[in-house]
Amino acid sequence: MQNAHSPASPNAMASPARVGSRPVGREAPRALPPRLRCRPITADDIAAILELLCEGFPRLPRQHWHAALDLLRRRDIPDGTSRYGYLVESDEKAVGVLLAITSAFDRNGRATIRSNSSSWYVRPEFRAFAGLMLSGWLRSPADTYLNVFPAEHTFAIIEQRGFVRFTNGMAMALPAAVWRGGGARVLAVDRLAEARFPVTAEDRRLLLDHWAAGCVAFWCEDRVGGRPFVFRRRWLKSRLPCAQLIYCHDIRDLTRFARAVGRHLWRHGLPVVLVAGNARVRGIPGIFINNKYPMYCRGEPPRIGDLAYTEAGLFGF
């Protein structure tokens, strides 16, 4: 969850001003507290939310937020969940925003709902009420709540709300340097009909959805079977292009198809692969940086290599 600023403790609430029957001395009358409430964002709020996002994250262009909100508008979402996320309003004017990406999955034959919070911003004078949106989001129906890009100053806040780390750092791998495993081939999403092995409807949808959002998505297969892969283009220190792993069925698939995947990404100008996890990627040259971009969850944690339908893949943060 990107955070524009450090909010006060989410549990802190401003005490309402006490209104007495008569003034004490010459004290100025105390202003009444603003009428605050948290509620789900609706289509009617989009213009106001867009302004808040541009205000809170000025380094991102306005078009980025247009695209993100339009993507949320077009997505299928589980019943009873918010399409866009939550806002805080004061006197019916939006003063805070928290976007949420909520998705239904079939994982290992079991239906599950996963929700990822993103882009948390509250105007400075209302920052003591930032936790209202967090509470609203955590009341929404989900089996897993994700915060994949928390700002460091929010670690303690989300830990107080029951979040725990499911990754502690970032692995950097060079799959193109692997020489074994020849014979595998890569099929882009527009060539899935050529696959020798069945591509399930869920895998096909996942690949197409992330490709449409700007990811490098493809199917890789060898003589034994095929697997989907999704990566997102990133930049290390604004100079070195790299590919962040967004999705694979099993992290061992990255090792199994390392040579084919690495060469395909190399042709896209992406020699380095980033994997959020807790150790190096086994069987691929690289390093692991501990305590670098840790990710948090509440509820059932996703497995390593599954950031599907999160801000990492859909928004490109």
Regions found by a protein language model. Name each.
Residues 108-171, 239-294:
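Acyl-donor binding region in acyl/amide transferases
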Residues 86, 96-98, 115, 120:
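Conserved GNAT-family N-acetyltransferase fold
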